[in-house]
Amino acid sequence: MTILVVDRYYMLMNLLFALTCLLLNLTHCFSPKKFNISAATTSDSDWSIAGSTWYGNPTGYGSDGGACGYGNAVAQPPFSKMVSAGGPSLFKSGKGCGACYQVKCTSKSACSKNPVTVVITDECPGCVKESVHFDLSGTAFGAMAISGQDSQLRNVGELQILYKKVECNYIGKTVTFQVDKGSNANSFAVLVAYVNGDGEIGRIELKQALDSDKWLSMSQSWGAVWKLDVSSPLRAPLSLRVTSLESGKTVVASNVIPANWQPGAIYKSNVNF
């Protein structure tokens, strides 16, 4: 008799539960496995925490090119002053030059909470308070603010931000090579810029004019500058093969350095990642 009463009690409770779900249109009452816990987390779940400061002119581009070697190009499109010096974990002894990151601030009233994209163009060797630190240009730091409150945000000076690495996408740009002003036929160095995708360079190789010539590995000189010293004069035109640091993808800029190349000249390829 007791078992019968209990069974009827549970049948009644199940019926009431089903009716409640129908009335409230709670379809997940019947399929709890469809509930995705990730959907209940914040949109910041794929972001990481970093420290940030800014340097240089309040509306400037940090320093003149900095430790990557880009020179005054950082003030012009496509960089457009939206650049940053990186602490050791971002600069990576120069291998981090050209990497693109989205950064945003959410902790201050002047923060827009909207991400902006910056490129690593300089080094901040003393930025070691946090494991990851962006020393942004004044322009980039202010770009994280609500419109009209960039000065207010810069006055904070030091700020905790959120960041994530993103692919670089220099619209309309191809990989560009600037021959170092000190280069000659036996000691050739080149600055590499506007690399899409990873942005970071893992390897540069050079091939001389003849089809039979082999690819020669260049070494990183400093920042985004790579060099090759040879005993016999290089025979131009020269082709350059660029391998990205993270993905390992490769592009070849065939005959990008012409036979009559000049130190300091800029040569644009017709390739990019």
From Swiss-Prot:
Domain of life, source organism: Eukaryota
Gene Ontology biological process terms, A to Z: plant-type cell wall loosening; sexual reproduction; unidimensional cell growth
Stored InterPro entries: Expan_Lol_pI, Expansin/allergen_DPBB_dom, Expansin_CBD, Expansin_CBD_sf, LolPI, RlpA-like_DPBB, RlpA-like_sf
Membrane topology, record value: Peripheral membrane protein
Residues in the signal sequence: 1-29
Pfam families named among the record's database cross-references: DPBB_1, Expansin_C
Expansin-like EG45 domain mapped to chain residues: 65-173
Expansin-like CBD domain boundaries: 186-269
Subcellular location per the Swiss-Prot or TrEMBL entry: Secreted, Cell wall; Membrane
GO terms under cellular component: extracellular region; membrane
Matching SMART domains: DPBB_1 (SM00837)
Protein keywords: Cell wall, Cell wall biogenesis/degradation, Disulfide bond, Glycoprotein, Membrane, Secreted, Signal
Residues bearing attached sugar chains per UniProt: 36
Cystine connections: 68-97, 100-168, 105-111
PANTHER family per the UniProt record, alphabetical: EXPANSIN-B2-RELATED (PTHR31692:SF56), EXPANSIN-B3 (PTHR31692)
Function comment: May cause loosening and extension of plant cell walls by disrupting non-covalent bonding between cellulose microfibrils and matrix glucans. No enzymatic activity has been found.
Family: Belongs to the expansin family. Expansin B subfamily.
Protein name: Putative expansin-B2
Organism: Arabidopsis thaliana
